[in-house]
Amino acid sequence: MDFVAIDFETATARRDSACSVAVVEIKDGSLQGSFSSLIRPPENRYAAFNIGIHGITPEDTAEAPGFAAVWPELAAYLAGRVVVAHNARFDMGVLASCLAEAGLRAPTFFYADTVAIARKAWPDLENHKLGTVGAFLGIDFHHHDALEDARACAAIPLRAGERLGETGDLCALAQKLGVRVQPFGGLRRGWRR
């Protein structure tokens, strides 16, 4: 199974306020590579609520690169790939908003939501939050650290594929589960900037 998992953390409720990003690349069902970076959000402004979630502060990102500087390396992982995210609407909205804010073109790739994969693969779980699914799968990780969340997210389709005997192709797994794999098209209606 080949795909990329992505996770963003944001500094405020605005989707263009990414302060951390991570991607992990899965090739033939194994971790092939990863990339993570702190990102200086616009004006390096943070909301206390968001700091309480991920612990990243303005001091942490004062000297961090902006999204545009991180983009070339991030884009290399995404272009032409199938990408997964846990609650993909959020992460795809962050990506689209950051691209729009920086005046950058959206890459061509497809994405699926690991919340939907988990709901179909393990419908009896109490909920399908990343922490709950991770605990069920025995994944030890520090939630709301972008790299650790991306790794935990990547484990979901791998483990669902093992459970269902569909370890070769993420799109085939998604089809078997009735989960949509859709094209990323940049900023869409309904995504707050």
Spans of features found by a protein language model:
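Acidic two-metal-ion nuclease catalytic site recognized across multiple nuclease folds
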Residues: 158-193
